[in-house]
Amino acid sequence: MRDPIETVMNLVPMVVEQTNRGERAYDIFSRLLKERIIFVNGPVEDGMSMLVCAQLLFLEAENPKKEINMYINSPGGVVTSGMAIYDTMQFIRPPVSTLCMGQAASMGSLLLTAGATGHRYALPNARIMVHQPSGGFQGQASDIERHAQDIIKMKRRLNEIYVKHTGRDYDTIERTLDRDHFMTAQEALEFGLIDKVVEARDVSADESK
């Protein structure tokens, strides 16, 4: 069975622009990158993480002061891959605005709440889900014990990140993340994961630019 993401990428439309040197064709995502828009779409894994981090670093080099917009629709995925994106978002100089369209689950929700304060959004029908990390291991008992200790440390670190970005106390975060916890956009706003639920673009802000 073919990878559905690969199938979709083969159908990515091209955008043709007229320049003083003639016509130039971009795939739609490259054209949006010119507008400082990055998509985090699908499972978070090493390949996606590499591409997102590279785009963040490129946009910082292009303009270290101008805001970057990250659109998220992700079920989550590998913790270390997500942490690479998170650390890069915090490392670069431009503020990163985040917006959830569809869903931001697991690591997707962490990336959503990691956006610049006041610039974390969700569309009205978006779904956000938070939970603790999970994993499965096999091998010697001593190795399994070490893996268990490591995942507990990772759980603690993820809780601390949610505390930092939501303003909630540690015990509340730990209780909330103990099981899969689903939220509507409005509930995510009330919890502190996002700053605003947006139904339409702010036309006045666009016109003032």
UniProtKB/Swiss-Prot annotation:
Its EC number is 3.4.21.92. The active site is at 106 (nucleophile), 131. It comes from the Bacteria. The keyword Hydrolase applies. The keyword Calcium does not apply. GO terms for cellular component: cytoplasm; endopeptidase Clp complex. Pfam families: CLP_protease (PF00574). One of its GO terms (molecular function) is serine-type endopeptidase activity. Its main location: cytoplasm. It is found in: Cytoplasm. It catalyses: Hydrolysis of proteins to small peptides in the presence of ATP and magnesium. alpha-casein is the usual test substrate. In the absence of ATP, only oligopeptides shorter than five residues are hydrolyzed (such as succinyl-Leu-Tyr-|-NHMec, and Leu-Tyr-Leu-|-Tyr-Trp, in which cleavage of the -Tyr-|-Leu- and -Tyr-|-Trp bonds also occurs). One of its GO terms (biological process) is protein quality control for misfolded or incompletely synthesized proteins. CDD domains: S14_ClpP_2. Keywords: Cytoplasm, Hydrolase, Protease, Serine protease. Cleaves peptides in various proteins in a process that requires ATP hydrolysis. Has a chymotrypsin-like activity. Plays a major role in the degradation of misfolded proteins. NCBIfam families: PRK00277.1 (NF001368), PRK12553.1 (NF009205). Fourteen ClpP subunits assemble into 2 heptameric rings which stack back to back to give a disk-like structure with a central cavity, resembling the structure of eukaryotic proteasomes. Belongs to the peptidase S14 family. This is ATP-dependent Clp protease proteolytic subunit. The lineage of its organism: Bacteria, Pseudomonadati, Pseudomonadota, Alphaproteobacteria, Hyphomicrobiales.
